[in-house]
Amino acid sequence: MKKLAAVMLTSCLMVAVGASFADEMKKDDMKKDVMMKKDDMAKDEMKKDSMAKDGMKKDAMKKDAMMKKDGMTKDEMKK
């Protein structure tokens, strides 16, 4: 009878330890998911910032092209 009680006790403890370990792993996975989401959000913000810079580049290119055209018309007027 003592052996049966000892086996039951050890098996219950093994199940409890396994469940505890599984919970810890689940919490760890949740932490990793949260960190990955934060990292993705940071990357999205970087993309938005680079898109704004692209807009500035395009605007500068337009101004540069307009100034070149203006310079050409002034040269034509001189002739």
Curated annotation (Swiss-Prot):
Protein keywords: Oxidation, Periplasm, Signal, Stress response
Record region (Disordered): 37-79
InterPro entries (UniProt xref): Penta_MxKDx
Primary location class: periplasm
Induction of its expression: Part of the SigF regulon, induced by chlorite under positive control of SigF. Part of the probable yedZ1-yedY1-mrpX operon. Transcript levels are 20- to 60-fold increased when induced by chlorite or hypochlorite or in the absence of anti-sigma factor NrsF. Not induced by hydrogen peroxide.
Post-translational changes noted in the entry: Protein is oxidized (possibly on Met residues) when cells are exposed to chlorite or hypochlorite; initially the protein is highly oxidized, by 50 minutes all protein is in the reduced form.
Gene Ontology CC annotation, any one: periplasmic space
Cellular localisation: Periplasm
Disruption phenotype: Growth somewhat inhibited by chlorite.
Signal peptide range: 1-22
Role, per record: Serves as an oxidative stress sink, specifically for chlorite and hypochlorite.
Protein name: Methionine-rich peptide X
